[in-house]
Amino acid sequence: MFTAPGMATTQERPYSCSVCGKSFQYSAVLLRHERAHGGDKRFCCLECGERCARAADLRAHRWTHAGQTLYICSECGQSFSHSGLLDLHLGTHRRRSRTRPCRLCGRRFPHVPALLLHRARQHPPEKPHRCPLCARSFRQSALPFHLARAHPPEIITVTAPSPSTLYHCTQCPRAFHSSAGLRNHSRIHVVPSLSDPGTEAHLCGICGKSFSKSSTLTRHLQRHSGEKPFKCPECGKGFLESATLVRHQRTHTGEKPYACSDCGRCFSESSTLLRHQRSHQGERPHVCATCGKGFGQRYDLVVHQRSHTGERPFPCPQCGRGFTDRSDLTKHLRTHTGEKPYHCELCGKRFTCISNLNVHLRNHAGHKPHKCPECGKSFSVASKLALHRKTHLGERTAECTECGKFFSHGRSLSQHQRSHRRARAAAMAATTTTTVVTEVTIGPSLTLTGPTEQEKSGLLVSPFQETC
């Protein structure tokens, strides 16, 4: 992580007020505080002339003119014009409080699902009985069943454990690096035993795969037939298994039962949560062979590699623009249709994607979690903080192609380029000559105009011109 020279840690408060002795972490915060002592009240109310030291104090004062009730946060004293905004703001305090403790280690969590996930991962129930073949652990009652199902002695032979352990098939010379690979392979050697119906295997007549239960074979055959018996009542989409339908229905209900124990973010599927937690652990197992950049999820690596190859497999059917990710295409299509499915319940403003709505809600709640380590200024999104920090570092990466001037923000460059366009338009207006043609009406239906180009050149004689 980037650390600026002389940057204070989260515990240090090196900037002290010379009047009251109060300490601050950032010099910019100290300057704002000292204005209250020095009488520097630069923010003036246009209604009554009242002056305030801070913009926040002026905003609170202006509500008194509007005759609206202020909703004050009992935790920090911040005021809001709407009870819904106060509720959103209070959520930031509730997330910090972490009121749900783990009875085993005392760690506190903001959500019950986060607590349950923590207990499952950090305090799993004891399973003292370890399988000697695959190292899985079980309670006493489950181990014999696992041995009978996963490691049938007539098929599997396991070599002595070593760093290069191989699992050898007793029916053919093939060997495998994992017991699961050997189990999948061993199905091709299993034949139904007519003499022992209890051990009869259920074979798929299409691909030859065998199953221990007829119900499992029936479910497998549905994959070949394309049958999807479980239909979503909302959109009609079909699924092979009921569990897949349950996960799909969460996209309609918005239910997200799996919460991250580190940041409280919720997800609709446990697999998505596990992939998300890699970002907290710093785990990036998927590495780009071209530039060496690491990713926590394989799909993110696939999308990233398209930036090297130039592949854009998702074209827009309206304008032909290509995208590297299907989700980017979905958001782009809304610019053509005008669809904005996500709306703010406080002000009614609508958005094309949920991430923009979340950023908008932070503005309502005054929640700005991204703080500049140099001056203490806070931002609601990380991208705005990154742009802001360029002003401290002196980076100017956006260059004007017309005059060569550099800017730290793309937005500043766009505003600058408008001045070039205005200058060009003014120059064109000044150099363009406009020909004014006057008309003289003679009689009710005869109109006399100025000379045409042909008449000027002498190629055509006007009927109203005398000839010699």
From Swiss-Prot:
Where are the zinc-finger regions (C2H2-type) in this chain? 15-37, 43-65, 71-93, 100-123, 129-151, 167-189, 202-224, 230-252, 258-280, 286-308, 314-336, 342-364, 370-392, 398-420
The source organism is: Mus musculus (Mouse)
Per the entry, what this protein does is: May be involved in transcriptional regulation.
Q: Name one Pfam family in it.
A: zf-C2H2_4
Q: Does the UniProt entry include the keyword GTP-binding?
A: no
Any idea what this protein is called? Answer: Zinc finger protein 672
Q: Which InterPro entries match?
A: Znf_C2H2_sf, Znf_C2H2_type
A GO BP entry is: regulation of transcription by RNA polymerase II
Q: Where in the cell is it found?
A: Nucleus
* GO cellular component term, pick one: nucleoplasm
Record carries keyword Cell cycle:
no
Write the gene name.
Answer: Znf672
Q: Which UniProt key words apply to this protein?
A: DNA-binding, Metal-binding, Nucleus, Repeat, Transcription, Transcription regulation, Zinc, Zinc-finger
